[in-house]
From Swiss-Prot:
GO BP: proteolysis
Domain of life: Eukaryota
Name this protein carries in UniProt: Protease Do-like 10, mitochondrial
EC number(s) on file: 3.4.21.-
Its job: Probable serine protease.
Molecular function GO terms recorded: serine-type endopeptidase activity
Region (Disordered): 60-96
A GO cellular-component term linked to this record: mitochondrial matrix
Name of one Pfam family that matches: PDZ_3
Length: 586
């Protein structure tokens, strides 16, 4: 697919994210943007909080999908017995114009008992020192109540959270909130509050439809510049798949000309008496150009959580496609003058499409919808969007019917769609990094957050080989990780090996390494006198006396005040395997 492919991991990670905590800009995309780098999307973050200035602030921000609004039900039941007044607001939807006289006034009436202010304390891990966390940060954002006593906000508002409080309008009391579910790809989260006092007088907002162009919306929230609720109004100017900066994702978004500022994140955009979307990011360097997450994406997220009990992600077909706008290109693949489509150039080995499609197939239609030569499909009122939107609208494990031209003959195949993960994770919020230390060698799985530790210009300053593999390589089997030597903690046992850092681990005692857990098992279960580790396409080798290395590991950990040689996630898995083995032996 053009935008939802595994190559999106590269393309979408390169968006300007100078205001985003943990994300860095890649200049190669800025060069392709023909001078428009100052107008790239930024995650609208939470406001600067009134905490001491020395405390670092939380700043909010590719491979992804969108969804089908016709499959989802609206969430309309109120939290309390108080009812939201249903106002009769007429609209000429066919013309795409709003006749609502005062959308801001209507939004205020709805928001007073629905929109809340969110206070978050968060702590991010250090990827260079994975056994440590960075300093604590405080931030603020917005959210609103939906049916079922739930609060919707942005994922970046509560990312890496350690403590969350909410406060409703007109109250001085903050209530403890728990994060029930987070979808970082779609930048959405669900909070729950146990306090009965909090829910007194609160009303649930109802999710509406995608607004048409030029329809009026009002964004409600708690942006910087004050402590009370704020309402800004504007009109819809564009509806199309957009870069979701926080999740490095491509999903449908709505562009509006209402001011969306830090602190607005998670607040509702209200159209009439329903929610049209959730405010989440804006364009740096541009005035009053903001983006809201549309209701189909919100409903997909909520429905997935309700059905599966957790966030399930957005589907991908797992293909990378080339536009076929050139006539000679179409002729070369035996396309008739009436045919349109896109050319399959790469296929993710872990996708269902890998077993069905072939390189140089031409995708003609998806679920009966013709695909144009530029990869777009029709979308209401003569608008067009990329066909990735249709793919991401599917539920996990749902099938799609694709029409394919192969060697001049048309075929139809049924393909199962599911969320796909890249070989190198694009983000790792709300979890501690994995690591394993042996003989002073710090082994970690390569992630893009690790590369971001190299600074703002990480695309150029991080190790070139690792950066290339992070953006280009595809997983060949499930559970595969790219394991590297992050650094070498100096000791007599590793003298002479101190420069063998930032290299990939390929083999341990001749066995190819699948992931960090596998490497840990290979080393811990070594039964030979010598331990051999092959690095970087077997061009570098480490040989250690195994028993001496085990003794040295304990001394190195004590010297560097490291509590454990193995991260908690690997330790838990290792203990479980030991318990299972003991049970089997009994």
């Amino acid at each position: 697919m053009l935008l939802r492919s595994f190559r999106t991991v590269e393309l979408l990670r390169r968006i300007s994210t100078s205001s985003v905590s943990g994300y860095r800009t890649s200049p190669s995309l800025l060069q392709r943007c023909n001078g428009f780098q100052s107008y790239l999307p930024h995650r609208v973050t939470t406001t600067e909080s009134p905490f001491p200035s020395h405390i670092s602030r939380f700043c909010s921000s590719q491979s992804a999908n969108s969804q089908n609004e016709n499959r989802h039900t609206t969430l309309s039941s109120p939290v309390s017995s108080r009812r939201v007044n249903n106002r009769k607001i007429s609209r000429r939807r066919k013309a795409g114009k709003s006749l609502s006289i005062s959308p801001a006034a209507d939004a205020v009436d709805l928001a007073l008992d629905s929109v809340v202010k969110i206070f978050t304390v968060s702590t991010s891990p250090s990827y260079f020192l994975p056994w440590q966390n960075k300093s604590q940060r405080e931030s603020m954002g917005s959210g609103f109540v939906i049916s079922g006593r739930k609060i919707i906000t942005n994922a970046h508002v509560v990312a890496d959270h350690s403590f969350v409080l909410v406060r409703k309008h007109g109250s001085s009391i903050k209530h403890r909130a728990e994060v029930q579910a987070v979808g970082h790809e779609c930048d959405l989260a669900i909070l729950v509050v146990d306090s009965e006092v909090f829910w007194e007088g609160m009303n649930a907002l109802e999710l509406g439809d995608i607004p048409f162009l030029q329809e009026a919306v009002a964004v409600v929230g708690y942006p910087q510049g004050g402590d009370n609720i704020s309402v800004t109004k504007g009109v819809v100017s564009r509806v199309e798949p957009t870069q979701y900066v926080h999740g490095a994702t491509q999903l449908m978004a709505i562009q509006i000309d209402a001011a969306i500022n830090p602190g607005n994140s998670g607040g509702p955009a209200i159209m009439g008496n329903k929610v049209a979307g959730v405010a989440f990011q804006n364009l740096s360097g541009a005035e009053n150009i903001g983006y809201i997450i549309p209701t189909p994406v919100i409903k997909h997220f909520i429905n997935g959580v309700e059905e599966c009990g957790k966030y399930i992600g957005f589907c991908s077909m797992g293909v990378s496609c080339q536009p076929m706008e050139n006539g000679e290109l179409r002729s070369g693949f035996q396309m008739s003058s009436e045919m349109t489509g896109v050319l399959v150039s790469k296929i993710n080995p872990l996708s269902d499409a890998h077993k069905i499609l072939k390189k140089d197939d031409v995708l003609l239609a998806f679920d009966g919808v013709p695909i144009a030569n530029d990869g777009t499909v029709p979308f209401r009122n003569r608008e067009r969007i990329t066909f990735d939107h249709l793919v991401s609208m599917k539920k996990p494990d749902e099938t799609a019917l694709v029409k394919v031209l192969r060697e001049g003959k048309e075929h139809e195949f049924s393909i199962t769609l599911r969320p796909l993960q890249p070989l190198v994770p694009v983000h790792q919020f709300d979890q501690l990094p994995s690591y394993y230390i042996f003989a002073g060698f710090v082994f970690v799985p390569l992630t893009q957050p690790y590369l971001h530790e190299y600074g703002e210009d990480w695309y150029n300053t991080s190790p070139r080989t690792l950066c290339h593999r992070a953006l280009k390589d595809l997983p060949k089997k499930a559970g595969q990780q790219l394991v590297i030597v992050s650094q070498v903690l100096m000791d007599d046992i590793n003298t002479g090996y101190e420069r063998l850092a930032e290299l990939q681990v390929n083999k341990v005692n001749g066995v190819e390494v699948n992931n960090l857990r596998h490497l840990c098992q290979l080393i811990e279960n070594c039964n030979t006198e010598k331990l051999r580790i092959d690095l970087d396409d077997e061009s570098r080798v480490i040989v250690l006396n195994y028993q001496s290395a085990k003794i040295a590991t304990s001394l190195i950990l004590k010297r560097h005040r490291i509590a454990s040689a193995i991260s908690s996630d690997l330790l838990i898995e290792q203990n479980l395997e030991t318990e299972l083995a003991s049970c089997s032996a009994v």
